[in-house]
Amino acid sequence: ALHSKECLRLWEESGFTTHVPSAHIIAAHVHHALHEDEDAARHLAQARRIGTETEIPIGIWLSYLTEAYFHIERNDEASAIPALGRGLQIGRETGLFGTFLWLPDMLEKVAARALEDGIEAEYVRELIRRNQLAPDPTNPYPAEWPWPVKVYTLGRFELHGDDRSIEFGRKVQQKPLSLIKALVAIGGKGVSEGRFAELLWPDADGDMAHHSFTSALSRLRKLLGKDEALELKEGRLSLSNRHCWVDVWAFERFLGQAEKARKEGKEKEAIRFFEKALSLYRGPFLPFEEMTWAVPLREKLRSGFLGAVAHLGRHHEKVGRWEEAVSCYRKGLEMDDVAEELYRSLMVCHIRLGQETEALSVYRRCRKTLSSVLGMNPSAETRSIAASIGRSPA
């Protein structure tokens, strides 16, 4: 606090008013760190006033972004939105993309918040690119971030580079694609070359397997156009979380955050994270990949998805929002039409709404789907719910 006060005094005495707003912003950060919110707000107001009087927009820009950052740090994100919107508007209109006052994690956090809410999105993406910002470590996988590489594996397989789909036609060799699929399937971090040899080149000897691995890795890097996206250290391959976004990583993180909030009794927060997770799940992991190494993660993610749908559905049921529960279970069945537990829950909701015909229709669909896909009949529990409708299922 003493150093920031001395810094401000020296700039004021120097007569170089262009730097005085930045000195006030530094002082505001010091007071914020000391939980002296009124003093922090006073310095931000001074920075804004001087910036306006001297017609130096960078001081105004930083004061608004700093105000938004303080609100985000206090978990008062709703209050951050007005300041964030005004600051980013000023930055866009005046062409501000850099600052000599570099404040750790501030730009990262306000940029992530802005992208999530769709505030000045194009300007924010350019701000991120020019400053080579990495996502906030507490929220490391925002899909809206302009990642150099994005990997989509849920319900599809797509690679994106700089927000554009990477096209790979019939001429593209499959081993580089298999390499990144397998890398994601077995964790994406620190996977040994030997493990890839076992999965992708099981019949090759040591030298041939090594040559195949290095060749596939080289082709994959060329396809992605970002060498740094794939890190090879001491024979272990990783996807860089500074350069790559993977839908599976984001999905699992949201599920983890939801479970943590649920265990802490923060139901509203848990629901928000479950909804974020479900928005990412477009279907099974690598649905057209037949290799056995894809199965464990596929089943794990499916279980997480069904658990999230069930939790959201029960939440709606608990507060009597039966129509919302119906919508939730239907969306779940769109992604996984052999999830018998979702059919049961959907039947119960229709019964509670007095929609017996719809409940019976759901049962018939369940019976037909389970028979044709899995070669099995509905469980006794499911048949019991159908029988409770008052009519024998046809």
Residue ranges and their predicted role:
Residues 214-221:
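Short, hydrophobic-biased segments on the C-terminal half of alpha helices
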Residues 42, 115-177, 227-238, 283:
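Short boundary/linker motifs that mark transitions into or out of structured domains
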Residues 182:
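Segments forming glycine/polar-rich beta-alpha architectures that bind adenosine-containing cofactors
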Residues 1, 11-26, 38, 51-66, ...:
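Alpha-solenoid helical repeat architecture
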Residues 1, 19-35, 62-74, 104-113, ...:
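Tandem amphipathic alpha-helical repeat scaffolds
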Residues 199:
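Residues within the alpha-helical elements of helix-turn-helix
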Residues 3-7, 23, 40-47, 63, ...:
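Tetratricopeptide repeat
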Residues 17, 79, 93-119, 168-177, ...:
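Intrinsically disordered, charged and Pro/Gly-enriched terminal/linker segments
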